Swiss-Prot record:
Gene responsible for this protein: rsmH
Domain of life from the UniProt record: Bacteria
Main subcellular location: cytoplasm
Entry keyword set: Cytoplasm, Methyltransferase, rRNA processing, S-adenosyl-L-methionine, Transferase
Species for this entry: Clavibacter michiganensis subsp. michiganensis (strain NCPPB 382)
Listed name of the protein: Ribosomal RNA small subunit methyltransferase H
Subcellular compartments: Cytoplasm
GO CC terms, sorted: cytoplasm
EC number: 2.1.1.199
Chain residues that bind S-adenosyl-L-methionine: 38-40, 57, 91, 105, 112
Length: 318
């Protein structure tokens, strides 16, 4: 199967349009913090012959596929196995200080969803894993088995925004006392049995629970909250950051960081704005951009995307 059949990059032309002005110089460095199968990065490298790419991913399978896809670019590409909050350490390891661009395409990748054995999908039976890096960390089965009812309720509320969190947490605890919950099909069955018929008609009842478990297993929100400031800190003046998020919890973190850094810190009433109070960032899009209907028809994954972008306007003063 061709790679483009597995994953079509979302808003590719718009991302390139936003990043390209900062990446024209020979040797300009772009960090793709969520490399995946490198669909975006391959296009960036093709369009910008002087570009150097640093690709980060926590998933060894994705890195292997990306490595093959980008092999033709030779030493213009460096790949690093790390979570994206490790951007600073990754750049230090390569001897790179400032960069001209950082790109994030957040959420679970098509590769991970399509690999049934990874357990991300509630529509196919598989071991309850959900780790983006299958070589390390807590599995979803362990969360379901070991977290108490209050902890399960918390993550379903906080990470899934699930109104039926108390009901689902209670039923899971009851069910695991009878036998371990080790597969996605068994978890879906428990959730469906606990869901009122009227709610089931509104959409798949397991969607938010699976999202919450995935976020908890991979610590996605806490990682993003560390990664955003780390990425901005590495941008050279004139450098740009572009972020694609796919659910409101991620987008809030991105919005908060970009808004804070694009706002003057001058005290109220100060007659003159001092240089150290000027915004570090200039926003490049108004609010969050969404995909149009044509893009969504071509690539259904784009339906939920929210794109934000900013340019580094000044260095942070000590």
């Amino acid at each position: 199967m061709a790679l483009d059949d597995i994953h079509t990059p979302v808003l590719l032309e718009r991302c390139l349009e936003l990043l390209a002005p900062a990446l024209q110089g020979e040797g300009a460095v772009l960090v793709d913090a969520t490399l995946g199968m490198a669909g975006h990065s391959e296009a960036f490298l093709d369009a910008l012959p002087g570009l150097r790419l640093v690709g980060l991913d926590r998933d060894p399978d994705a890195l292997a596929i990306a490595g093959e896809r980008l092999a033709r670019f030779g030493d213009r590409v460096n790949l690093v196995h790390t979570v994206y909050d490790g951007i600073g350490r990754a750049l230090d390891g390569l001897g790179i200080g400032e960069v001209q661009g950082v790109f994030f395409d957040l959420g679970v990748s098509s590769l991970q969803l399509d690999r049934v054995e990874r357990g991300f999908s509630y529509s196919q039976d598989a071991p309850l894993d959900m780790r983006m890096d299958g070589t390390a960390g807590l599995t979803a089965a362990q969360v379901v088995a070991e977290y108490d009812e209050l902890e399960l309720r918390r993550i379903f509320y906080d990470y899934g925004e699930e109104k039926l969190a108390p009901r689902y947490a209670s039923r899971i605890v009851q069910a695991r006392e009878v036998e371990p919950i080790t597969t996605s099909a068994r978890l879906v069955e428990i959730i469906q049995q606990a869901t009122p018929a009227a709610v089931q008609r509104a959409g798949h009842p397991a969607k938010r629970v699976f999202q919450a478990l995935r976020i908890e297993v991979n610590q996605e929100l806490s990682v993003l909250a560390r990664a955003m400031p780390a990425a901005v800190d590495r941008l050279a003046v004139g450098g740009r950051v572009v972020v694609e998020s796919y659910q409101s919890l991620e987008d809030r973190i991105v919005k908060r960081e970009l808004r804070a850094r694009s706002t003057s810190t001058a005290p109220v009433g100060l007659p003159v704005e001092l240089p150290e109070h000027r915004p570090e960032l200039k926003l490049l899009v108004r609010g969050a951009e969404l995909a149009d209907q044509h893009e969504i028809a071509q690539n259904p994954r784009a339906a939920s995307v929210r794109l934000r972008a900013a340019e580094r306007a000044r260095r942070r003063h000590a």
